[in-house]
Every structure is written in C-alpha cells, then in structure tokens.
C-alpha cells in the first residue's frame, strides 16, 4: 500500500508539472487578451431578448473552447520553433527548449486542445466553432508554418488569428457575422503589427540570431519605428469608428487612450531605441484591453 501511495503521489507530481509546462507554452497572457476580445464580441452581439440558459452555455462554450484552441495553437508553435527559440534569450526558458516537452508531444497535445476546443464551440453554434477553428488554423498553418519563416508580412496577415476570437464571441451570442463584428475583429487585426513590431525592435538581435524575418530585422531602427507609428495611426480610426455603435463614453475613453498611444509611437519614431520600443510594446496590450473593457462596460450598463 505504501509503495502504491508513493507511486500515485509521484504520478500526480509528474502530471502537475506537465500541466504547468503546457500552460507555459499556451501563453496565458495572450489567451487572456483573446478571451477579452471574445467577451467584447459576445456582449456586442447580445440580442435584446435573451434566454439566460442559452446565453450562459454559449458564453462558456466560446471562452473555454476558444481558450483551449488558442492554447493548443501556441503549444504546437512551441514544437515548431524549438531550434529558433534556442537562439533567442527571450524564449530560452520554454519547456520545449529545455526538453521538458518534446516536439511530437507538443504537436499531439496542441492538436487535441484545438479539436476539443472546436467541438466545445459547437455548444454555442456552428459559426462559433468555425471561427474558433479558423483562429487556430491561421495561427498554426498560415502564420507559424508558412509566413513567419519567410516574410515580414507574417505578423500582419497573422493578425487575423486574433480577429477570429472577436468574431467567435459575436457569433456565440448572435449566431451571425455582421459589419460590427467585422470592425471589432479588424481593429484587433490593425493593432497586431504595431504591438509585435515593437517587441521585435526591442529584441532585434534575438530575432536576427533566430533568422526570423520580422520587419525590424530587415530594416533599420528608424524605418521600423516609422512603420510602428504608421500602423498605430491607421488602427486608431477603427477604434473610434466603433464609437458609432458604442456611444459617447466609449468614444471619449478610446480617444484619450488612442492619443496616448500615438504620443508613445511618435516618441519611438523620434528616438528609436530598445527602451522606447519596449515602452511601446508594454503600452499596446493595456491599450487594447482598455478599449475592449470599455466596450464591454458601456454595452452592459
């Protein structure tokens, strides 16, 4: 009995460590922002007359299903990029790099997460499941396998993976895809390049060592900073345009935070250093979070 207890305890420890490794690879912070996008889409799509049970099931389906599929895609990405991650200080801690999660294991677990997440999406409706699967497909196949190793357009086109989260949320509550849901998803698409180019400019040497053709690797710092500023400037009108649907409070908040984001973008352009790029990167996620949270709050009150 004692040996059995020890064995069970060791198995539990081993499984818990594996679970922690999978969570690390799934990038919880990224998933939390995608979930926020899904919630914003869900709230925007809520009909005037709702069935409480149906809405709760649909909400849980898109959040749980979307989180699993997104996490699965990132776990597969970890398996795909072991060699590149070894060359980058920023990613050298990942369980796939340390050998704690093997390549085939990452592919298997990630695929299971995506399939299960998509199936859960069907509890809302088929359109929700479609967008959940689409987000994972864009991230794994279009971005990670096809574009990321080949072109600086990788993160631009790959931004549609984030858009799919918002579209899935809207579909879960409304069962439809409309101009409003498109605009919300397109806002996330437009936000993506400035966010990740700022990160790539901060860790330019890392990306260069890994031979990943991010824009800041292929151009000088000033050109990269200019691209970030232009990208953010092009995004802002879409953030404000949603104000036509969301009302005055949202418009005021989005104007204030957008002005601050543009201020930081101009600062980066005038002084394109790693520190300024890091400030731009660290601001961009809270910017999007504030936009989405404001949208959620004003539509619920």
Swiss-Prot record:
One of its GO terms (molecular function) is protoheme IX farnesyltransferase activity. The chain crosses the membrane at residues 30-50, 55-75, 106-126, 127-147, 152-172, 177-197, 233-253, 281-301. It comes from the Archaea. Carbon 2 of the heme B porphyrin ring is defined according to the Fischer nomenclature. Pathway: Porphyrin-containing compound metabolism; heme O biosynthesis; heme O from protoheme: step 1/1. This is Protoheme IX farnesyltransferase. Pfam families: UbiA (PF01040). It is a multi-pass membrane protein.
């Amino acid at each position: 009995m004692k040996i059995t207890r020890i064995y069970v305890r060791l198995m539990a420890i081993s499984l818990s460590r594996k679970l922690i490794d999978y969570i690390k690879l799934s990038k919880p912070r990224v998933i939390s922002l995608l979930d926020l996008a899904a919630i914003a889409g869900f709230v925007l799509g809520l009909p005037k007359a709702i069935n409480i049970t149906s809405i709760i099931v649909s909400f849980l389906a898109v959040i749980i299903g979307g989180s699993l599929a997104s996490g699965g895609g990132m776990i597969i990405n970890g398996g795909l990029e072991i060699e590149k991650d070894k060359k980058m200080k920023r990613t050298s801690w990942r369980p796939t790099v340390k050998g704690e999660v093997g390549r085939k294991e990452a592919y298997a677990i990630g695929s299971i997460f995506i399939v299960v997440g998509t199936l859960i999406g069907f509890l809302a409706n088929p359109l929700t499941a479609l967008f959940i699967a689409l987000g994972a497909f864009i991230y794994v196949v279009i971005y990670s396998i096809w574009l990321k190793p080949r072109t600086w357009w990788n993160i631009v086109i790959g931004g549609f993976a984030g858009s799919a989260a918002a579209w899935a949320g809207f579909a879960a509550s409304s069962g439809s895809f409309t101009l409003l849901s498109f605009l919300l998803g397109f806002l996330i698409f437009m936000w993506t390049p400035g966010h990740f180019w700022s990160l790539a400019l901060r860790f330019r040497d890392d990306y260069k060592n890994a031979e990943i053709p991010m824009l800041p690797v292929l151009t000088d710092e000033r050109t990269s900073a200019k691209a970030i500023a232009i990208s953010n400037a092009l995004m802002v009108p879409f953030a404000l345009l949603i104000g036509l649907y969301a009302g005055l409070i949202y418009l005021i908040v989005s104007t204030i935070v957008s002005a601050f984001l543009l201020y930081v973008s101009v600062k980066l352009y005038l002084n394109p250093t790693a520190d300024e790029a890091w400030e731009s990167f660290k601001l961009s996620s809270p910017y999007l979070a504030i936009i989405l949270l404001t949208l959620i709050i004003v539509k619920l009150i």
